[in-house]
A protein has these predicted regions:
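S-adenosylmethionine/decaboxylated-SAM
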Residues: 2-9, 15-140
Length: 140
């Protein structure tokens, strides 16, 4: 995998453009999987050797997260988790995909620093949560 193909700054691109710029055949993680739609794009365009899908799939009553469109009721969260598990069952059995039902801060503790070639951060969308994800999954 070569990071020299990835521009230093990517501005005003949609994630559908971004995914085509990410390194291929590496070890990657998606933080905040929701229904798994972008996970499919990651597999298609980035073709990672290993993709870790990390999401708590749990409704949160935090005031700062209540308005988020992916903070759906608990039964819908369970349905999303089951759907993602079914959607990627083949890749899980082949060892290409691992599904982690956990909060990102908890999941990060299970990986050594520098394990990932890249991480797509799209879990909780608050400043503090994104900063924590960047800190927890940083290779440094």
């Amino acid at each position: 995998m070569s990071s020299d193909k990835l521009p230093t700054y990517i501005i005003h691109h949609s994630r559908d453009v971004l995914i085509q710029l990410l390194p291929q055949e590496g070890i990657a993680a998606e933080l905040g999987v929701a229904e798994g739609a972008f996970s499919e794009s990651i597999l298609k365009y980035s073709r990672p050797r290993k993709l870790h899908l990390i999401d708590c799939w749990e409704h949160q009553d935090r005031e700062d997260y209540l308005p988020d469109g992916n903070n759906v009721p608990e039964d819908e969260q369970q349905g999303r988790f089951e759907s993602v598990s079914e959607m990627f069952a083949g890749q899980v059995s082949e060892g290409q995909v691992a599904i982690h039902r956990a909060f990102t801060t908890d999941a990060a503790r299970g990986f050594e620093r520098g394990y990932f070639d890249w991480v797509y951060v799209d879990a909780m969308h608050t400043y503090d949560a994104v900063l924590a994800d960047l800190r927890d999954f940083s290779p440094l």
